[in-house]
């Protein structure tokens, strides 16, 4: 497995998610050069100007430019945020047909440049579109990563932190499966400030109802946000920046992403949300969590849901 070289990033798609990611990236000073590609040239020009004016106050300088696909040739990463937007009431899986075609076009142009880095995909439905990018690119599986359940896990940790009045950084809990309606919480391995959530459940049976409500709020958060403001952006932008940092700083840190399975959880040939160790090679390894029989049953349902959609296109 080869390491990606340099800190240049090409961002494809400067909508709400893409710009939020670019803003987070600049504030964290991770890229030397951020080239942005978007079909709306006028709006892109305004975003590039606006971001560059903010770079003045960042801790380190990021050169932000209007990009072309030729910029991908020497990029360490290509981050895809482009695609048809999710409409109010529309599930992520309903976006498949439109966005698979968009991915095929984008990936063809990227690979024609000679790109040899890492793809990070955020377009929805992210698990299936990450699989599409892998198939269309011909790259090794570990160099194609989806944002997966990074945002869902963050939402879950935040809400658990609110319940127990601790910082989210002291909450260790994962959402796995599809980034969408069939995802599931892994309560069996979750800890709050080092205390097992399973142990808390044993002591307080009524806690189960509160946790189920928190999970439902986590799962449905995107629908509420989209209904209120049209799209999700800041949370996923920060999540993408976290994955980017893990890659470019070669951190070998476990992050909940969409990764290709090779027998983990008894599944293969699908991209799905699970913790994975990430570094400059992309995904070093998938982390297979020890989950209960009930959690496994729900995970299998999630995997089958994705597979049924995926097989219509691949």
UniProtKB/Swiss-Prot annotation:
The cross-references to Pfam families, in alphabetical order and at most eight, read: Ldh_1_C (PF02866), Ldh_1_N (PF00056)
Q: Name one GO molecular function term.
A: L-lactate dehydrogenase activity
Which chemical reaction does it catalyze?
(S)-lactate + NAD(+) = pyruvate + NADH + H(+)
Indicate whether Phosphoprotein appears among the record's keywords.
Answer: yes
Which positions bear Phosphotyrosine? 223
Residues the entry annotates as binding beta-D-fructose 1,6-bisphosphate: 157, 172
Stretch forming the signal peptide: none
- Looking at the record's lineage, which domain of life comes first? Bacteria
Q: What class of enzyme is it?
A: oxidoreductase
Q: Where does substrate bind?
A: 86, 92, 124-127, 152-155, 232
Keywords carried by this UniProt record = Allosteric enzyme, Cytoplasm, NAD, Oxidoreductase, Phosphoprotein
Instruction: Describe activation and inhibition of this protein.
Output: Allosterically activated by fructose 1,6-bisphosphate (FBP).
Pathway it works in:
Fermentation; pyruvate fermentation to lactate; (S)-lactate from pyruvate: step 1/1
Cellular component terms (Gene Ontology): cytoplasm
In short, the EC number is: 1.1.1.27
Gene Ontology BP, a term:
glycolytic process
**Which residues are responsible for catalysis?**
179 (proton acceptor)
UniProt cross-references to PROSITE patterns, sorted A to Z: L_LDH (PS00064)
Q: For binding NAD(+), which residues are annotated in this chain's numbering?
A: 17, 38, 43, 69, 83-84, 105, 122-124, 147
Q: What is its main location?
A: cytoplasm
Q: Where in the cell is it found?
A: Cytoplasm
Q: Give the family per the record.
A: Belongs to the LDH/MDH superfamily. LDH family.
Subunit relationships: Homotetramer.
Question: Which HAMAP family does its entry note?
Answer: Lactate_dehydrog
Its recorded name reads L-lactate dehydrogenase
Species the sequence originates in: Corynebacterium glutamicum (strain R)
């Amino acid at each position: 497995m080869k390491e990606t070289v340099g800190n240049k990033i090409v961002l494809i798609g400067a909508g709400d998610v893409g710009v939020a990611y670019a803003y987070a990236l600049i504030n964290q000073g991770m890229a030397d050069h951020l080239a942005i590609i978007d079909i709306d040239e006028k709006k892109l020009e305004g975003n590039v100007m606006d971001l560059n004016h903010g770079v003045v106050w960042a801790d380190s300088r990021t050169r932000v430019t209007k990009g072309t696909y030729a910029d991908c040739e020497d990029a360490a990463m290509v981050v895809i945020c482009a695609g048809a937007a999710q409409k109010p009431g529309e599930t992520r899986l309903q976006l498949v047909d439109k966005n698979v075609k968009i991915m095929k076009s984008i990936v063809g142009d990227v690979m024609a440049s000679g790109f040899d880095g890492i793809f990070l995909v955020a377009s929805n439905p992210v698990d299936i579109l990450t699989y599409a990018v892998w198939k269309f690119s011909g790259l090794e599986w570990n160099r194609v990563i989806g944002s997966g359940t990074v945002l869902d896990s963050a939402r879950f940790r935040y809400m658990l932190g609110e319940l127990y009045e601790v910082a989210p950084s002291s909450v260790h809990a994962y959402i796995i499966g599809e980034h969408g309606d069939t995802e599931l919480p892994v309560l069996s391995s979750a800890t709050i400030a080092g205390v097992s959530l399973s142990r808390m459940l044993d002591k307080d049976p009524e806690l189960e109802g509160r946790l189920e409500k928190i999970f439902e709020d986590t799962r449905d958060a995107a629908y509420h946000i989209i209904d209120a403001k049209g799209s999700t952006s800041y949370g996923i932008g920060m999540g993408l920046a976290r994955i980017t940092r893990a890659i470019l700083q070669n951190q070998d840190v476990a992050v909940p992403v969409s990764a290709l399975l090779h027998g983990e959880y008894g599944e293969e040939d699908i991209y799905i949300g699970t913790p994975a160790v990430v570094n400059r090679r992309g995904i070093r390894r998938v982390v297979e969590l020890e989950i209960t029989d009930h959690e496994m049953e729900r995970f299998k349902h999630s995997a089958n849901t994705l597979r049924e959609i995926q097989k219509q296109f691949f």
